[in-house]
Amino acid sequence: MGGGVLKQQFVLHAPFLPCGDQPEAIRRLSQGITDGVPAQVLLGTTGSGKTFTMANVIANVNVPTLVLAHNKTLAAQLYQEFKAFFPENAVEYFISYYDYYQPEAYIARSDTYIEKSLLINDEIDKLRLSATRSILERRDTLIVSSISCIYGIGSPDNYSSMALTLEVGKEYPRSQLSSQLVRMHYQASSTPQRSAFRERGSVIDIFLAYESDLAVRLEFMNDTLISIEYVDPLTMIPSHTTSSITLYPGSHYVTPEAVREQAIRTIREELEQRMLFFEGRPVEQERLFQRTTHDIEMIKEIGFCKGIENYSRHFTGAAPGEPPTCLLDYFPDDFLLIIDESHQTLPQLRAMYRGDQSRKQSLVEYGFRLPSAFDNRPLTYEEARRYFHRVIYVSATPGDLEIQESRGHIIEQIIRPTGIPDPLPEIRPAKGQIDDLLEEIRQRLRKDQEKILVISVTKKLAEDIAAFLAELGIAATYLHSGIETAERTQILTDLRLGNIDVLIGVNLLREGIDLPEVSLVAILDADKEGFLRSSASLIQFCGRAARNIHGKVICYADRITPSMDHMLKETERRRKIQLDYNQQHKITPQPIIKPILANPITKEAGQEETRLKMQSSKELEASIKTYEEAMYQAAQEFQFDEAVKYRDLMNAAKKQLLFQKGEEENGD
């Protein structure tokens, strides 16, 4: 296990104090952790301030913490919130770094091999490395992660053993230092870029793999290190000095030489065994021999090869079938695990392993990979549970598993700081539901800034309703999984800005929608039993209207299903608690005021590129600078879809500038 070395305290910064149910929830959760309770549930209604409660608990127990979210969007939201709560501490972000990923596969029936194809997001790679660096260095580390935390990465022992500590006044032969940096996956480069270094006379500049705001300048007299400075990576202006520094590797897959040599030996042994297995199958034999020996040569020469993760077991020394090392192994034993939206996250944990193994079966069976590739995988659910020493499950609708594992340690957080109670759903006949819905929509359109969410049972119905409303002059659109992430973000922004009044979708829970303007949630065909009409889903849908003081929920159904009955009883129970609290404390519900962050890209890339062709060289240079600044700003704010668009526009502007300069030179 990795262990922190610096013992800073978590320092909570908040412009408000806990209120409502929060103080009691914070006290009980904190006490439970202190008392060694292995699992607790925070059952908090939508809008009750669960993240703020979590932040207070983290500050109280003061141990390294992992917050697990079920998708990247939610992880980014949580990261930004915790970053604001803990500006003095190491709040980190760990998600999949693939912008695009096509896994390696073989389809036997058509003899089709699909090579792995991927595009790594450089900014997210930096954040992942920053996360592991922090958890190894300091105790006041909070990492917000997606399900990526259960996927194999390099061993924390290998990673930390390859870290390089330098001290002013000591001697470091320059050639050996350069070689060590290369082994740490830093490349020699004359231009400043992440995971690189450059030598100029007595100075070595190192552009860290896990930092974008600071680079390191080492100054030598002969081989004696006389100065360590942190500098701005763009201007190279010094920021501050230090007497010592620990540099961490540029990859999680770095290995010491002895480990690498041992891995090469065991890979060869496995290859020999597999060649015997494929006796009489010359195609598979030759394929596996060529591929594996090429990989071995690459590992010998540069310590790395394409697809090195498929040999990870050989580098960690694990036996076949043993769990892979993952982010969880970088944490000390006493860490706190918070699983947000646990009713969705836990099923995800269960599903990851099965899909991974079925794909690799053909690759191993037909000689594309050694059997050890099976061990480059996510943890199984049972393996992941071994890390659940101190866990808090957080959900408005926890599942049976969380309830069972918490053994009665369930802490409710029902009261909202705004005083807004849960809306009590109305049940109306499914027959004529569209006509009734239309009248409800028209009533809200007469008011200012009131929006409507409509939950349908199919994508086709969502599209048809949106088209029907649009024909009547109502600003409506649909939202479902067939729409790309960037467009979904723009649709939600347009709803808040008033460009859209009605949003129709199938599973609007997955979008992480937090829209205080929504005053009506209409659930069509609420009596159609299924995953999206379960009691948990219905309660979650109702919560979408609980951020508006005029919030209303209508369920269109011809009968009351068991799921609907449970939803109605639970909503009524919560609503009574909330109203009694408001009356007792003389609280008047207040509307939520949430700033609207408009999508900065309002034109299609094609239109922008057409406009670029009409610009002069000087204007193009200005556009390049503008797009570059916007790209970095979007990346820092975790708006990666926007960052990619700005990057593409910047590259288009650069291409156009080169074209224009070429024409100018030819004209001369």
From Swiss-Prot:
| All residue ranges annotated as the Helicase C-terminal domain in the record | 433-596
| Any single Pfam family the record assigns to this protein | UVR
Q: The UVR domain covers which part of the protein?
A: 621-656
The Gene Ontology biological process terms listed for this entry are: nucleotide-excision repair; SOS response
Question: In the UniProt record, does the keyword Ribonucleoprotein occur?
Answer: no
What GO cellular component entries does it have? cytoplasm; excinuclease repair complex
Keywords noted in UniProt = ATP-binding, Cytoplasm, DNA damage, DNA excision, DNA repair, Excision nuclease, Nucleotide-binding, SOS response
Subcellular location, principal: cytoplasm
HAMAP family according to UniProt = UvrB
The record's annotation in NCBIfam families points to: PRK05298.1, uvrb
Functional note:
The UvrABC repair system catalyzes the recognition and processing of DNA lesions. A damage recognition complex composed of 2 UvrA and 2 UvrB subunits scans DNA for abnormalities. Upon binding of the UvrA(2)B(2) complex to a putative damaged site, the DNA wraps around one UvrB monomer. DNA wrap is dependent on ATP binding by UvrB and probably causes local melting of the DNA helix, facilitating insertion of UvrB beta-hairpin between the DNA strands. Then UvrB probes one DNA strand for the presence of a lesion.
Self-association or partners: how does it assemble?
Forms a heterotetramer with UvrA during the search for lesions. Interacts with UvrC in an incision complex.
What protein is this chain from? UvrABC system protein B
Organism, as annotated: Chlamydia trachomatis serovar A (strain ATCC VR-571B / DSM 19440 / HAR-13)
Give the encoding gene's name. Answer: uvrB
